[in-house]
């Protein structure tokens, strides 16, 4: 093969082409690739941050859910405790009312018993006077002998 002027001219033009490409074309291409690489790195970092934030959000939501469950359990326990207190208060009030009713009934029964005893005493006194009158065959004056009849009632 002969090395002639065409080959030398082509080599010179090729060297000039490489120099122009390295001087004017290559730096913007390198800058574009570096920018793209930085964008990709930022995207990956953002994805990593997003994943981390998602994990934190999941943890916060689990904590909030647990806390809500604890609060609801506390509310239920407080409600049950309050309901038990209300039941106990109602039982106490009912017992007091029942005791009052029983005491009132006992007092009323005692009054009725005393009234019946009083009526019975009066009736016994009348029967005693009637019996004594029949025995003596004379009339005993109830107003004249009121002291004696009162003493008889007391004895009975």
UniProtKB/Swiss-Prot annotation:
Keyword vocabulary terms for this entry: ATP synthesis, Cell inner membrane, Cell membrane, CF(0), Hydrogen ion transport, Ion transport, Membrane, Transmembrane, Transmembrane helix, Transport
GO MF, one example: proton-transporting ATP synthase activity, rotational mechanism
Membrane topology: Single-pass membrane protein
Keyword Transmembrane attributed: yes
Transmembrane spans: 7-26
Domain of life: Bacteria
Hydrolase found in the keyword field: no
Chief location of this protein within or outside the cell: membrane
Gene3D superfamilies for the chain: F1F0 ATP synthase subunit B, membrane domain
Pfam families: ATP-synt_B (PF00430)
InterPro entries named in the record: ATP_synth_B-like_membr_sf, ATP_synth_b/b'su_bac/chlpt, ATP_synth_F0_bsu_bac, ATP_synthase_B_chain
Subcellular localization(s) per the UniProt record: Cell inner membrane
GO CC terms in record: plasma membrane; proton-transporting ATP synthase complex
Quaternary structure note: F-type ATPases have 2 components, F(1) - the catalytic core - and F(0) - the membrane proton channel. F(1) has five subunits: alpha(3), beta(3), gamma(1), delta(1), epsilon(1). F(0) has three main subunits: a(1), b(2) and c(10-14). The alpha and beta chains form an alternating ring which encloses part of the gamma chain. F(1) is attached to F(0) by a central stalk formed by the gamma and epsilon chains, while a peripheral stalk is formed by the delta and b chains.
Known function: F(1)F(0) ATP synthase produces ATP from ADP in the presence of a proton or sodium gradient. F-type ATPases consist of two structural domains, F(1) containing the extramembraneous catalytic core and F(0) containing the membrane proton channel, linked together by a central stalk and a peripheral stalk. During catalysis, ATP synthesis in the catalytic domain of F(1) is coupled via a rotary mechanism of the central stalk subunits to proton translocation. Component of the F(0) channel, it forms part of the peripheral stalk, linking F(1) to F(0).
Protein name per Swiss-Prot or TrEMBL: ATP synthase subunit b
């Amino acid at each position: 093969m002969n090395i002639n002027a065409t080959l030398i001219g082509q080599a010179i033009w090729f060297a000039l082409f490489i120099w122009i490409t390295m001087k004017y074309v290559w730096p913007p291409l390198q800058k574009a690739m570096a920018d793209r690489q930085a964008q990709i790195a930022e995207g990956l970092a953002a994805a990593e941050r997003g994943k981390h934030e998602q994990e934190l959000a999941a943890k916060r939501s689990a904590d909030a859910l647990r806390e809500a469950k604890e609060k609801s359990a506390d509310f239920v326990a407080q409600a049950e405790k309050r309901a038990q207190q209300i039941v106990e208060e109602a039982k106490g009030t009912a017992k007091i009312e029942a005791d009052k009713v029983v005491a009132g009934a006992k007092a009323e029964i005692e009054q009725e018993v005393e009234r019946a005893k009083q009526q019975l005493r009066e009736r016994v006194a009348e029967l005693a006077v009637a019996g004594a009158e029949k025995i003596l065959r004379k009339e005993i004056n109830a107003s004249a002998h009121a002291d004696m009849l009162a003493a008889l009632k007391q004895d009975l």
